[in-house]
């Protein structure tokens, strides 16, 4: 894995030196992952309920909040999985058949936050990202969409969802990462994939 990442970075930096270096500054996943692992029993329960890998949930917790259930971002993303009440929170409420959106206190509750984060990952996988065949590519697409929206990702391939999914299915995981690094409008999108791999390796 480390050799593959090193080779990929050499190619990327040589061929696209003007692009943002998404591995700089380096991110040490050890402490955030250790803190996120304390919530693994809840992540396993939520993962089983929504068909989501608990390790993916744990990695997102490490990246998003460093395992802090009271974390609040400048954009008002809240809790362990940094859920925005008015967007992903509202989407989860709709999936559950509820009206409105989650409260701040609800999103600071570890069990509720992780459950909603897992539910949102399921919404992405079974909705806009449905049809992606390669499990690793799907994992990368999930975290990029979780952080920056599925629409922004799909539009880098095509304005038509079916065509976008078809183009994604022509790529392996490294090619998908290269596409995101070169074409996604958000510089943090490829960095999120980099952090995901760092977090998974630290578990």
Swiss-Prot record:
GO CC annotation, single: cell outer membrane
Protein name per its UniProtKB record: Endo-type membrane-bound lytic murein transglycosylase A
Chain residues carrying a lipid of type S-diacylglycerol cysteine: 16
Gene from which this protein is expressed: emtA
One GO term of the biological process aspect: cell wall organization
Major subcellular location class: membrane
CDD domains per record: LT_MltC_MltE
Lipid attachment in record (N-palmitoyl cysteine): 16
Chain coiled-coil ranges: none
